[in-house]
Amino acid sequence: MTTAIASDRLKKRFDRWDFDGNGALERADFEKEAQHIAEAFGKDAGAAEVQTLKNAFGGLFDYLAKEAGVGSDGSLTEEQFIRVTENLIFEQGEASFNRVLGPVVKGTWGMCDKNADGQINADEFAAWLTALGMSKAEAAEAFNQVDTNGNGELSLDELLTAVRDFHFGRLDVELLG
């Protein structure tokens, strides 16, 4: 993937996560993203899986802030966010990506797995992606692309691979909104 494509995808993510539109990402923006996801799944703010997701997004913010040199009470500019994230993708590689983004994917996956069977079926996946603004038809097509073993269900590993592949330019299905 070219740096231009990565930068475009990361700019889109920055804009989505900048909830208050002030041109910077703060911890509150990451907390609001976790809340937004929880609400999309109809989860109560006090639910354990909501707290897990909030903690995961908090950890992601802490990582980004530390790498940008702004501290956990600071804020990241778009340039800092893109620089740190491109470094994660292009320099540090897949293992680091999994370590940093894995908890966020796992937290979202936990909310998506409504029947708690350890897998995400096509209906659960569609509920997630339609909450992000995709049509049901787009969600069905995305499921088919992400279900790499073709068993009609997604494991946590398949989902993390899909998120990573999007950021590495190997997949065009955006799963984190």
From Swiss-Prot:
SUPFAM superfamilies: EF-hand (SSF47473). Residues 5-40, 45-90, 100-134, 134-169 form the EF-hand domain. GO terms for molecular function: calcium ion binding. The keyword Flavoprotein does not apply. Ca(2+) 3 binds at D147, N149, N151, E153, E158. Disulfide bonds: none annotated. Keywords: Calcium, Metal-binding, Repeat. It holds the Pfam family EF-hand_7. This is Calerythrin. It comes from Saccharopolyspora erythraea (Streptomyces erythraeus).
